[in-house]
Amino acid sequence: MFIEVVKSKIHRVTVTEANLNYIGSITIDEDLLDAANLIANEKVSIVNNNNGERFETYIIKGERGSGVVCLNGAAARKAQPGDIIIVMSYAMMDFEEAKTFKPSVVFPDTATNKLI
């Protein structure tokens, strides 16, 4: 039996930009992606701590060290700069493997979006 578990999580990161006229996605600083074991084009779930919105999109790699977290396209309507969000991805795995699996979780500084 396979189950879906949290694979990666960026916990409490600040939205720096919202670009409604882009083709959809979330742009994230490459340092955060590496630390959380996330890659470009990976599907992610977003939770907005400020307004309770929950939605899915995919990742675009942002400039390393920039602290960028930009919601693009329709997702730009779900959060605004300054909002605190959580970014999560999931993986399917065997039930027994899932019992011992440890997700990659990072807790960036919400003022700078840099790793602490």
Curated annotation (Swiss-Prot):
InterPro entries in alphabetical order: Asp_de-COase-like_dom_sf, Asp_decarbox
Pfam assignment, any one: Asp_decarbox
Keywords assigned: Autocatalytic cleavage, Cytoplasm, Decarboxylase, Lyase, Pantothenate biosynthesis, Pyruvate, Schiff base, Zymogen
Any single biological process term in GO: pantothenate biosynthetic process
Subcellular location(s) per record: Cytoplasm
Record-level GO cellular component terms: cytosol
Residues at the active site: 25 (schiff-base intermediate with substrate), 58 (proton donor)
Residues with the Pyruvic acid (Ser) modification: 25
Cysteine-cysteine disulfides: none
Note accompanying the cofactor annotation: Binds 1 pyruvoyl group covalently per subunit.
Pathway assigned in UniProt: Cofactor biosynthesis; (R)-pantothenate biosynthesis; beta-alanine from L-aspartate: step 1/1
GO molecular function, one term: aspartate 1-decarboxylase activity
Modification note: Is synthesized initially as an inactive proenzyme, which is activated by self-cleavage at a specific serine bond to produce a beta-subunit with a hydroxyl group at its C-terminus and an alpha-subunit with a pyruvoyl group at its N-terminus.
Cofactor(s), names only, from the UniProt record: pyruvate
Assembly mode: Heterooctamer of four alpha and four beta subunits.
Similarity comment: family membership: Belongs to the PanD family.
PANTHER family: ASPARTATE 1-DECARBOXYLASE
Function of the protein: Catalyzes the pyruvoyl-dependent decarboxylation of aspartate to produce beta-alanine.
Record-given protein name: Aspartate 1-decarboxylase
Gene: panD
